Amino acid sequence: MKLLPLLLLLAAAIPVAHAQKASFETEAVKKTVTAFFDGMRHGDSTAVRRTLAPAAVFHAFSNQPNQPTKLGIESINGFLKSVGTPHPEIWDERVQFERVLIDANLASVWAPYEFYLGSKFSHCGYDSFQLVKLADGWKIAHVIDTRRKEKCR
């Protein structure tokens, strides 16, 4: 009978331990995405590349009025070259982490954003990131986003 209170205490601690681990992993995922945008803001293509998984994929789609949506693959190397090439304005993508879902070594991030060239608003939309947990931490495996100039949050 004396063992029952101890077992109940241990059983109550399991969800707390799981929640702490989930919170730690969520913060680690957010840290990777934040490092991606910090690198972009600083024009540091090496910092951006460190956040990417090998064979990462960026998708882009065009959504022109009266035209079917077209999906294409953006060149990672082209993107990194653009980030690292000096440009007059800071590329400032301001994200908010609306949803972070994690199952084992897979994470999905859904984040509304606003993009500024320097202090001038350019566009807004939603970023969708897929991350994988590799030996050296969470890495971005896939990015796709929407883009528009109005009807932002």
Where are these regions (language model features)?
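Short beta-strand edge/turn micro-motifs at domain boundaries
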Residues: H123-K149
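Surface-exposed, charged secondary-structure patches
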Residues: L71-G118
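Sec-dependent N-terminal signal peptides
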Residues: L3-A13
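Short, low-complexity N-terminal intrinsically disordered segments enriched in polar/charged residues
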Residues: A17-R50
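Hydrophobic pocket/interface hotspot
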Residues: F36, V48, A56, V109, ...
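Extracytoplasmic
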Residues: G43, T51-A53, V95, A104, ...
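Short, solvent-exposed secondary-structure junction/capping segments
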Residues: T34-D38, L52-N66
